[in-house]
């Protein structure tokens, strides 16, 4: 037997320790680069990239019919991915799950698993096709935009990376465990990512704080609520962080007990396992107060119902559930990805800049490809044009040639053409010798020369290149405009979230059933007087909008209820929605008691002692209290006003105290006897206005009456007081419907009726009276006008926002409304047809408003 250790042996001796190290390192790099970690540019692991590319080549696209998943898996493992079919199918399934992917890359048909942990059906039963978004990952791949590499056996080629018009790594996130390292990148909102990228294009040196004005944080496909910004900021700054996510819940009231309903779960939480976990904790008496847990989820969404015992407090039970179950989880962020064949942890800004760099590279390569193609075509057309310009000579030359080669050589020699041009001339059909075909060739050549010039300019100009990226990003956003799902709330030990929230003007609406939302006021474009408006909210069949107002996101909202309680809430904590969104139940935002109803909502920026809060009730009562008495925030609220039986709040106004105003410190004065004037309306028709010093309160009634009296005649009283009479009604069925504060008699008061009839009137036309009088006519009411709805002070910097009973909002320039006298009706302000105006408010003007129509060009004058 030959000695294997002899010098003549072909066997090479190696050190086993070094061999193991080398082999393990090779294996590690293979797993890291070729399997477990995503590429930082397109956000895909090799298996995901190969699945999409195989579907693209196999024509299993979203514009075609579904194909069997087994066909896709077979194409992937046969052509690109030399691994087991199970691994490929599992990856395909996850790409189609809307609870795993924020924006699924594949549309599945059949059983693709569930949030309860159910497995997908076998690949022979399910079908799949590319989603519309995945086309954006592969667009322009046929234009030499990315490098191709040989597949595992060298028989075909596959893309090293996809062109990816979307920032897919941040969009859908990624998770994976490699050798000695792992990645866990959360998904994000497409709209926010694009807004951040557009800002970064305009501001190359933008800071993280600036970018986070647009990219608020992760947006998980299962929704939930993120508590705290510190973990998000740390993850975005360093690439590592921890994000606390809770289930989204609401409380429903039943007879003598509460019900906790889970609407959304933390990302990657198994719903069935969660229900089992809660049941086990109740059985072991680790959580008290729960009588039943059941799953009422359906195709509309998640609904896990937790019924409580009568004596149980929902807040305590809910806190225990968060503490003891997966209703609260922590998402550990590790933004690790492959770049230049090496793993690296990225910050948010680095990933955004890397995506923009990738897109620049793709667009440059695409432009070069299109330029070469255009130049090649122009070259051919130039040859054809030369031939057409010398058609008789060309025909004679070809006829006198013995063969094609001779003809080609003769054309090249005679006209200075290239071989390509000569071949194109020889291949040209006789039909192209017509005048029409000649014109087509000339037009095509002219267009090509313009296109060549455009493409050359792109390659020369960084600005044009970035403009192309901007246009593509805006196009993507318009195609896939999906609002954020996951809410982000402040944490008890968090930084001041207001530093990260822009102070924007919002329209806040609340419905009869207590659904509240905020919408940027810019979404309601100003319309011409008499316009029909835009739908402000979609309500349930038995619901309608009760009130709306405008406020800034940093303002504090004071909610006053029918029980006289006052609660607080920051505007930015109200979920932002679209114009037609239903909103969120207000009971999830403030601690209302059972059957308690909100009657007034007042926005304020501070609780200055120089300000007062004036309440007006339906029965004509006015009450004034120093605003500072409402600043001590408690979760159970504070007492705001005592109401008489059958009375309710109409409005509440914050008023700045007059500088020379002096208040009595003793008991309640009999202000009824401190009269200035108390003249009947009939005697005021020919009277001159009476001027006064200081602010005045102006209240109006449903039947068109009004009263103006000095603010100083309503002194400040305590929080729990009742108030005093503002106006006495002439008619039994009359009631107070609105009130404003007048600074001086030069101001204009805008009044509007239920049928959209309105006018502007100088405040001086309304005589000053004593508080508690019967008032004077504010608006002349008829069958065409119906009842008076309310009044506002005209402000040239503000627009009027009117709300109808069907939920439409219309924005009107107050200056476009005609001025009219006190005892008149006015003109059509809002065209309500069979609808009615139910509320009005003021909001800031927008710069790009439409021009208003003049009174001479529009409408009905009801003077």
Swiss-Prot record:
E.C. designation(s): 5.6.2.2
Pfam families per the UniProt record, alphabetical: DNA_gyraseA_C (PF03989), DNA_topoisoIV (PF00521)
Subcellular location: Cytoplasm
Domain of life: Bacteria
GO molecular-function term, one example from the UniProt record: ATP binding
Principal location listed in the UniProt entry: cytoplasm
UniProt xrefs under PROSITE patterns: TOPO_IIA
PANTHER family hit by this protein: DNA GYRASE SUBUNIT A, CHLOROPLASTIC_MITOCHONDRIAL, DNA GYRASE/TOPOISOMERASE SUBUNIT A
Subunit structure: Heterotetramer, composed of two GyrA and two GyrB chains. In the heterotetramer, GyrA contains the active site tyrosine that forms a transient covalent intermediate with DNA, while GyrB binds cofactors and catalyzes ATP hydrolysis.
Protein name as it appears in the record: DNA gyrase subunit A
Organism ancestry: Bacteria, Pseudomonadati, Campylobacterota, Epsilonproteobacteria, Campylobacterales
Name of the gene this protein is made from: gyrA
